[in-house]
Every structure is written in structure tokens, then in C-alpha cells.
């Protein structure tokens, strides 16, 4: 099926979730975003695409009674981060006063050739009190909010190990004179988490109240060192999604971490799901807060043999079956169990982020997706450089509403 011409937008409680948007229509890359090949130096493709996407999202949020000015969180995926500065110039046009918190990373190809970025936005309903806060943590000289409180939810911008003066600061680097003493990924992770501690304390909360994490690693071989530090900060860890990315916005940065927390008064319920495979790493399968359930990114693994046997193609019959369909079905069946344990159901999903190692697997993924979702929730699909289980093709990250 071709990409939807209009964003899918769903309200859940006080929040409004939109599908990730690229600059495409039913004919491919939208004509009004193209640079005339006869005049290749006149105009900016990234600026045109950014405007096109934000105009579409403006209309979509208006249908739910919200506007871009009510957006509180953005995930932005660029196929080439050298486009970031021009993108941010347009971002300032659309968010002149209170920009949303933002996480920006490099990603692989989009679903439509020629599309340079994907924008994923979440908004708050206009009648809900929103408080923007600042912190003493280092901040980049670009257009985003450090933190926004919406009811009991605390949204923060993604953080890298940077002081935004020298790049990666000395305290987050291994001394080049002593290259075998210490770990860059551990130092960067610790630096980031220390700054997040400052961020959430400024909101009157703490790391203890984090309810969801997205982690973007440039090299997945760094995961184990990162996870060791993660355990120091999270004795009781939140749900987490971890994917590989080709690039980050700070030179030599190895990881970007993106967190959502809640206020101390909000009740958090960790969800135990005994009938799905127990993860090897340090995260919870799901967590319920108020009327939302946040699930960890799910992979097609039993955490014993790698790719789960029932998700594999029999090597003796390599042309019988589809690996991407098998993995997608395996993951969604486990997410059915996860949401059931939380007291809700898969059909109440209000937001999905899907990470594919090969964007050409999208068609097979979508066939199975539509078996489970005749009407798809808002969905963002991005190409990652890798996942944490060898030979896994897909990771699925879902948020569901309570009945």
C-alpha cells in the first residue's frame, strides 16, 4: 500500500499522537518540494521538505483541536545530518516561541526515494496546562525546549555527551595518552545520565520516575558497556528501545539517549509478562502510567538462540516463507500478551515506531501489520543500521491506551 496522503492522528487522554511524516504524496516525492534540475542551485530541498511536512502536520493536528504550538515532543530522523542546520532554520519559523523537546538522529533510507527526513510529533490538548522548564545542563544552540511538563508527564530532549562548546568534553573522553584506561562509551553514558538527573530534578522529579527510554547507538558493540552504566542509574529500569544509527549531531558522540519521566505523584506500574521471553539486558517489558502503557521495543528473539526458531526460515527450504513476516508476527503476538498483562489490548495502540534494518522489508512487514491492525495507529517507520540480536530484521515500539 502507498503511504497515506494525510497523517494519521490519534488522541489518547491529554496527548495527541501523529504518524511520522515524509515529504511525499501518492505520486512519490511531492512535486512542490523538488528542486528544478534546470536550476539546481536555486532553493533548498531540505527546507522545502521540512515546510511541506510541517504544513501537513499543522492540518492534521487542527482536526483534533490542537496546533503545532501545542507540540511537546519531536523525533526527527535525517538521512544526512549535514542537512540539519537548514532544517533547523525552518523549524524556527514554525516554532518561534515554544519549540517542542526534540531528539534528532541520522537514519537510513526513507520509504520514498528522494525524501530526506521524517518528522514524528506528539502534542498536548490545548486545555491541558503545560510548563516549559530550563536547567543548568549544557544545551545546544538550536531550537528546542529542554523540558516540558504536561500534566504528570515530563518530556525531555534527547541528550548526547557534549558541553556544546568543545564537542565531547574531557570528562566524557578517554585520555588519548592513556587509550587503554577507561571506556569512551561508559564515560559518555555516565555524562549523559548525570545531565538527565539535573534535567528531571529541575522538573521536581528524578531518574527513578523515568517511564520510557530510546537509545541510539552509532556502534552496537558499545551496547554492553552502555548497559553496565545504565544499571548504575536504574536499579528498576524502564522499558527501553535500542537501535543503531549511522550518525549523531556531535562529532565523536557515540550515543544519544531520549527519556520520558513522570512527576513523583504519578503512579507507575511495572508490568510483568511471564509468557514472553525474558530479556538479557536491563529493561522492563512494559510500564503503565495513568491511561497509557509504554512497551519496550520488541524483537523476534527468545533470548536463548538468537532469532526465535518460529521466526526463522528453515535453511533447508530457503524459498518457503518470509523472514520479515515471521519476525513481525512473532513480535506482535508477544505484544498482544504484553498489553493483555497490562489490562489493555493491541487494538488500543495509539503510537508505533518501527525500525527496519532493510527498508525494502516494509512491504512484507505491512502485510502482517494489517492482519493485526485493519486500521493502523499512527506509525513511524525508519531504517536502522542494526539491532541488538544478530539477524533480526525489525524492532517494534508501541504505546497503547487503557480501555
Task: Say what each PLM segment does.
Residues 1-55, 59-73, 77-194, 198-212, ...:
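N-terminal presequence-like segments and the immediate start of the first folded domain
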Amino acid at each position: 500500500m502507498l503511504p497515506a496522503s494525510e497523517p494519521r492522528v490519534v488522541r489518547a487522554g491529554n496527548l495527541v499522537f501523529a504518524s511520522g511524516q515524509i515529504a511525499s504524496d501518492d505520486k512519490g516525492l511531492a512535486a512542490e518540494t523538488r528542486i528544478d534540475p534546470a536550476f539546481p542551485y536555486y532553493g533548498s530541498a531540505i527546507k522545502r521538505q521540512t515546510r511541506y511536512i510541517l504544513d501537513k502536520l499543522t492540518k492534521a493536528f487542527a482536526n483534533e483541536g490542537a496546533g503545532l504550538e501545542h507540540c511537546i515532543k519531536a523525533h526527527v530522523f535525517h538521512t544526512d545530518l549535514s542537512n540539519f542546520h537548514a532544517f533547523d532554520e525552518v523549524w524556527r519559523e514554525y516554532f518561534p516561541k515554544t519549540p517542542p523537546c526534540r531528539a534528532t538522529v541520522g537514519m537510513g533510507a526513507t520509504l520514498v526515494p528522494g525524501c530526506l527526513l521524517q518528522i514524528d510529533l506528539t502534542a498536548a490538548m490545548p486545555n491541558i496546562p503545560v510548563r516549559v522548564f530550563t536547567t543548568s545542563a549544557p544545551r545546544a544552540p538550536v531550537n528546542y525546549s529542554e523540558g516540558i511538563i504536561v500534566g504528570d508527564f515530563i518530556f525531555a530532549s534527547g541528550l548526547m555527551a557534549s558541553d556544546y562548546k568543545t564537542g565531547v568534553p574531557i570528562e566524557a573522553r578517554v585520555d588519548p595518552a592513556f587509550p587503554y584506561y577507561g571506556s569512551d562509551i561508559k564515560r559518555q553514558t555516565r555524562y549523559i545520565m548525570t545531565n538527565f538527573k539535573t534535567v528531571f530534578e529541575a522538573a521536581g522529579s528524578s531518574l527513578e520516575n523515568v517511564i520510557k527510554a530510546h537509545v541510539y547507538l552509532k556502534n552496537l558493540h558499545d551496547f554492553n558497556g552502555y548497559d553496565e552504566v545504565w544499571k548504575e542509574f536504574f536499579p528498576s529500569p524502564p522499558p527501553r528501545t535500542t537501535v543503531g544509527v549511522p550518525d549523531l549531531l556531535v562529532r565523536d558522540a557515540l550515543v544519544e539517549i531520549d527519556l520520558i519521566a513522570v512527576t513523583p505523584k504519578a503512579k507507575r506500574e511495572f508490568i510483568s509478562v511471564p509468557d514472553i521471553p525474558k530479556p538479557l539486558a536491563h529493561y522492563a517489558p512494559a510500564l503503565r502510567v495513568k491511561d497509557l502503557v509504554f512497551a519496550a521495543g520488541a524483537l523476534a528473539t527468545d533470548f536463548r538462540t538468537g532469532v526465535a526458531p518460529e521466526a526463522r526460515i528453515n535453511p533447508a527450504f530457503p524459498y518457503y516463507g518470509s523472514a520479515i513476516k515471521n519476525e513481525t508476527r512473532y513480535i506482535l503476538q508477544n505484544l498482544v500478551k504484553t498489553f493483555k498483562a497490562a489490562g489493555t489490548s493491541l487494538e488500543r495502540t495509539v503510537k508505533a515506531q518501527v525500525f527496519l534494518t532493510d527498508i525494502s522489508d516494509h512491504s512484507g512487514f505491512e502485510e502482517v501489520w494489517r492482519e493485526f491492525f485493519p486500521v493502523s495507529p499512527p506509525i513511524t517507520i525508519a531504517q536502522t543500521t542494526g539491532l541488538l540480536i544478530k539477524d533480526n530484521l525489525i524492532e517494534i515500539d508501541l504505546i497503547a491506551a487503557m480501555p
